[in-house]
Curated annotation (Swiss-Prot):
PANTHER family: UPF0145 PROTEIN YBJQ. Coiled coil: none annotated. This is UPF0145 protein SPO2021. Belongs to the UPF0145 family. Pfam families: YbjQ_1.
Length: 104
């Protein structure tokens, strides 16, 4: 499965558009990790706890996106957009959307 942010795939022709597909993931952050992440942010370091959560959420959203594209009979998703949003006090939502297509 080819997943790309570009509107097409160089050297390949889109032969069918199957529709818009979306994958979403909402992850809760652990309170203890939040405290340590805040301390890390204050001293100017990177927060490994948040980075790990963000990576997990992104991978889950993209995996769902691919699964929905496969269910439509697509072999690629073009024009993929990733959006990140904090929900409530400690929830992270990642959504991935794009167009499921068939490439030759």
């Amino acid at each position: 499965m080819i997943v790309t942010t570009t509107p097409n795939v160089e050297g390949r022709r889109i032969t069918a558009y199957k529709g818009i597909v979306v994958g979403e993931a909402i992850m809760g952050a652990n309170v203890v990790r939040d405290v340590f992440a805040s301390i890390t942010d204050i001293v100017g370091g990177r927060s490994g706890a948040y980075e790990s959560k963000l990576q997990d959420a992104r991978e889950t959203a993209l995996s769902e996106l691919e699964g929905r594209a496969v269910a439509l009979g697509a072999n690629a998703v073009v024009g993929v957009d990733l959006d990140y949003e904090v929900v409530g006090q400690s929830m992270l939502m990642v959504s991935a959307s794009g167009t499921a297509v068939v490439l030759d």
